[in-house]
């Protein structure tokens, strides 16, 4: 099956210009199904929140590889924009404004990011004589809240249209 033109490749997936104003994020072969489902469910949980983001439409299976269909967002990455313009201050302003708009939307129906971090810490120490105890204790001391944590917020993951 033709997935369309490749428009990006990352650590976990390749993104294709799919059809009808949508892109396909096709996860690399062997990427865990539960991780794909978690990404889809987390994205769907954002549907009613007031900040710009692509909408997810569903999980697809293409020749044994799982993918998620998203809205196609046109624009350039903030990384490319800042390299083109040299406007570091403008980049910081765009990122701060977007980050504020994300934080202005409390969210309650997604998994705890603290629990996610603790789980990853435990996995990273598996088979080691060291223990993640100190770090997990610090995480436990952080307050719980309803703020959304993107987890991968950087200029390469932000698309802009003519400087906005």
Task: Place the predicted regions along the sequence by residue.
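Conserved N-terminal boundary motif of the eukaryotic protein kinase catalytic domain
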Residues: 1-5
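Conserved short submotifs of the Hanks-type protein kinase catalytic core
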Residues: 64-77
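An alpha-helical support segment within catalytic cores of ATP-dependent transferases
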Residues: 104-151, 156, 161-162
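Conserved kinase catalytic-core helix
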Residues: 79-113, 132, 138
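Short beta-strand micro-motifs within the conserved protein kinase catalytic domain, predominantly
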Residues: 55-66
């Amino acid at each position: 099956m033709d997935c369309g033109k490749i428009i990006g490749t990352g650590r976990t997936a390749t993104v294709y210009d799919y059809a009808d104003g949508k892109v396909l994020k096709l996860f690399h072969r062997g990427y865990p199904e539960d991780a794909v489902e978690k990404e889809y469910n987390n994205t769907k949980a954002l549907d009613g929140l007031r900040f710009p983001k692509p909408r997810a439409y569903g999980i697809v299976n293409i020749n044994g590889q799982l993918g998620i269909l998203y809205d196609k967002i046109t624009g350039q990455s903030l990384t490319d924009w800042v390299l083109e313009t040299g406007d570091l201050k403008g980049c910081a302003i765009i990122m701060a404004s977007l980050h504020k708009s994300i934080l202005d939307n409390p969210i309650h129906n997604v998994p705890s990011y603290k629990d996610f971090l603790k789980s990853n810490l435990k996995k990273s120490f598996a088979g080691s004589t060291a223990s993640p105890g100190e770090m997990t204790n610090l995480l436990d001391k952080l307050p719980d809240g309803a703020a959304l944590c993107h987890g991968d917020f950087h200029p390469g993951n932000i698309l802009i249209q003519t400087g906005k």
